[in-house]
Amino acid sequence: MGSGYAKKKKEAKLMERQFMEMEASLEQKRFSGEAGNGLVSVTINGKCNLVDVKIKPDCLDPEDPEVVADLFRAAFKAAKAALDSEMSAMHMGMPF
């Protein structure tokens, strides 16, 4: 086990550190999505945790409460797509 092993071990530690830094950076970022022309907006962080939800009163219909749920799901899906896009771009720069 010569210098090749030591070099690989050093590279692995560097990649691990870069990955942890990337993960910490991603957690601090915010990703937003909206639906219904902005009637519902959702913000998540890089760990996909819900940070904020905004619902405009215009979409609150007591006769059809499912509308809000549908808009929420669509807004969350848009925010998650933004997060996935960012993660994909970050992984493109990783050597593995």
UniProtKB/Swiss-Prot annotation:
Known function: Binds to DNA and alters its conformation. May be involved in regulation of gene expression, nucleoid organization and DNA protection.
Superkingdom of this protein's organism: Bacteria
Entry keywords, A to Z: Cytoplasm, DNA-binding
GO CC entries: bacterial nucleoid; cytosol
Main location: cytoplasm
HAMAP family: DNA_YbaB_EbfC
Sequence similarity: Belongs to the YbaB/EbfC family.
Subcellular localization(s) per the UniProt record: Cytoplasm, Nucleoid
One GO MF term attached to the UniProt entry: DNA binding
Coiled coil: none
Subunit structure: Homodimer.
The name this protein goes by in its record: Nucleoid-associated protein TC_0612
InterPro entries named in the record: YbaB-like_sf, YbaB/EbfC
